[in-house]
Amino acid sequence: MINKKIKQQIVEALRENLKKYPSANKMAIAIGINAAQLSRILKGDWENVISDASWLTLARKFDIAIGLQSPIVAAETETYKFIITQLSLCQQQSLSAMLCDYAGIGKTFAARHYVKQHKNAIYVDCSQVKSKQKLIRQIAKEFGVDHTGRYTDVYADLVYYMRSLDHPLIILDEAGDLDYAAFLELKALWNATEYLCGWYMMGADGLKKKFERHLYNKKVGYAELFRRFGERYQRITPEGKEALEEFKRRQIAIVAKANGLTNIQELYVKTQGSLTRLYIELQKIKNVA
């Protein structure tokens, strides 16, 4: 059961998020409810408008802590600053880039945080939408474009809408999970919005290996897509074991201090430098406190 305090936080997040969309109807599509329901919720009518499951989905979408979860304070780690700068450039100048780096360094957190604060920027977790149709429909949904009709209509409407937006940005996280047809469709969508949309593809070693393998085997489409995304695999972490460990230690220290913790060495040992694991440790500590 979602209590009133959590619902109030969700409504505040909805009001803030509404600033990113040209209309309430567009945002309603993006968050998965209808415009009438959204209108009632924003006016304070919360009872029996949407299900608890829908409230839970909204809480997750806006990173609102529920139950035993506690909010985590964002910290400007090296990863955070690098990605925020890259995303800003890609959006402002309609550029495309690819980032391939270790898991657990804060790539996803930085990308999602950027999207919260910038109009016409969307985040897509490709591990959840691996096929061509699911990917394009999800992109359409995030922009507030109808995504439930015939696929050809959804694609055409999406292209038309993207071309009308002021500097849209699409962030593709876990892009290495996309299937071949989805990659080809990405190339087509990139072509249809050339110079009008920024793109940022992120992943770990799997994304880099996928491109390297298909480029080596000359699989159709990969060379063209690689060229469109800058023809290089960017990374944040330094080369060398010692330098990498020091990098991770610095990031752990920055996030821990931002969240009021001082036992840096203990946290580093427990997490092995992973910010994902640090999040779990922070939840444990805050729930005990």
Where are the model-predicted features located?
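Walker A/P-loop nucleotide-binding motif
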Residues: Q92-H113, S127-Q128
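Conserved catalytic segments around the Walker B and adjacent sensor/switch elements
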Residues: H118-Q128
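Sensor-1/coupling segment of RecA-like P-loop NTPase cores
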Residues: M98-A103, W190-G221
